Amino acid sequence: AQAFPAIIRAKKILVLGDKKQFSNLQSYQATSIINNTYQNKLRKVFRENISKDAIQLERLASFNVKTSILDFFQRISNYEARLKKHFRGYPEHIAYCSKTFYNNDLQAIRLRTKPIKEVIHFENLKYEIKDEINNSNKKEAEHIIKQLEKIKSDKTSVSVGIITPFTDQQRLITSLIQKHKDKDYFEEELKLKIMTFDTCQGEERQIVFYSMVATKNKDKLNWIFPVDLANKDLEEYGDKKAQRLNVGLSRVQEKMYFTMSKSVEEFKNEIGNALRFINNIWASEEKLPKNKDLDPKSPMEKEVLQWFKQTPFYLENKNKVELK
């Protein structure tokens, strides 16, 4: 509805979007009663002046304020293409999203030149929630703030984001930051932004801390993330829980830092699959030649090695692959 005035004035229209990420928020939250009223009026005018054909009336359903521009134009587009290049993070950062949502089609442009431990980190605090309110975890919040203090003391110039599944945890971390003596430094120098998986679309940070909140005895992540994505057509259903997972795990540029209160093996459903997939990349030992082992007279060897390290086959089987 917002784009309609521009659409009727255009000679050519280029629509960019991704059905596996969130659609326009205002359209998603549009009032159903008002929307249905407009649709009923539209059907009446269409039947009286254009056609009563059932197929055409079915297509008329796309004239819906909750239908995204992307969905609307997919029915009548002359040409479609998928943009496969990923410029934000390293191959290891995007491997899960590429495999799960894009059939391993994403191609990370940036080549990792630092150890895997410097681009992915898992911290298990082995903590059980006690007096926290609702879906919050004070231990994880305090741990992340200590890491921010360390970044400041090391005088590291980076941008930082914090992403959590729960609004309660977002509020808790925000409250602790607001009371912190280094609040201004965090916000101005580190460009700190505290987000949920629902509010991080369009954002990117060099270091992203994930506060998962869940513990052994209290885990409500099934309300946030999908149970299982196997055999599910994400294009067809536009599952918001799946979109949430795809968006949240693709915001990082340099380092993913997962802060948890239990081991990755204890997480259930699809978020457990995601964490274990990324953890396997982080924990696996690389059995590849070092740069010093390559032939200095063959500069392409280094590039070929980097290309091989980006392949889905290698990322999923690092422990089993040895290259000499």
For each of these PLM feature ranges, what is it?
Residues 2-12:
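Short, conserved "post-DEAD/DEAH" coupling segment immediately C-terminal to helicase motif II
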Residues 75-121, 263-265:
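Coupling/hinge elements of helicase-like and P-loop NTPase modules
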Residues 100-178:
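Conserved helicase/translocase motor-coupling segment
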Residues 18, 83, 202:
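Active-site glycine-centered loops adjacent to acidic/histidine catalytic or metal-binding residues
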Residues 12-17, 258-259:
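Structural recognition of the conserved hydrophobic beta-strand(s) that form the central parallel beta-sheet
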Residues 25, 29-81, 220-323:
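Helicase C-terminal subdomain and adjacent C-terminal extension
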Residues 153-161, 170-190, 195-250, 262-267, ...:
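Conserved helicase C-terminal RecA-like lobe
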Residues 1-4, 24-27:
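Conserved ATPase-coupling elements of RecA-like P-loop NTPase cores
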